[in-house]
């Protein structure tokens, strides 16, 4: 379970970085050269999703919970936005959903 969760967090970081770098280029006038590491990051994201042993739909559903929590951590750490109690609650609910789905992988 820990390996799966850590893999999901790495996957989420790859996706967020792959989307954040073009955002910097489009909205913050950063260099277009950021598109190269963005593309590499998104390729890494896709590859990481293939490393899970479950059916792709289950992987995507469970990954969504970790993505929510990771995106909120990114919001706090990178963007400097203070998270509300409801943000934390939502992340907890999303992670609980991920744990429920991943627990069912063995039964399916």
Swiss-Prot record:
Signal peptide: none annotated. It is a multi-pass membrane protein. PANTHER family: UPF0060 MEMBRANE PROTEIN YNFA. Keywords: Cell inner membrane, Cell membrane, Membrane, Transmembrane, Transmembrane helix. It is found in: Cell inner membrane. Pfam families: UPF0060. This is UPF0060 membrane protein Spro_2289. One of its GO terms (cellular component) is plasma membrane. HAMAP family: UPF0060. Belongs to the UPF0060 family. The chain crosses the membrane at residues 6-26, 31-51, 61-81, 85-105. The keyword Cell membrane applies.
């Amino acid at each position: 379970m820990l390996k799966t969760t850590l893999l999901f967090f790495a996957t989420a970081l790859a996706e967020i970085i792959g989307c954040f770098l073009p955002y910097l280029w489009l909205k913050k006038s950063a260099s277009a050269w950021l598109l190269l590491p963005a593309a590499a990051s998104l390729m890494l994201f896709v590859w990481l999703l293939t490393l899970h042993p479950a059916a792709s739909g289950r992987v995507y559903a469970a990954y969504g919970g970790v993505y929510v929590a990771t995106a909120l951590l990114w919001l706090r750490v990178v963007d400097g936005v203070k998270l509300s109690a409801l943000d934390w609650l939502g992340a907890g609910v999303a992670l609980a959903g991920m744990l429920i789905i991943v627990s069912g992988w063995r039964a399916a």
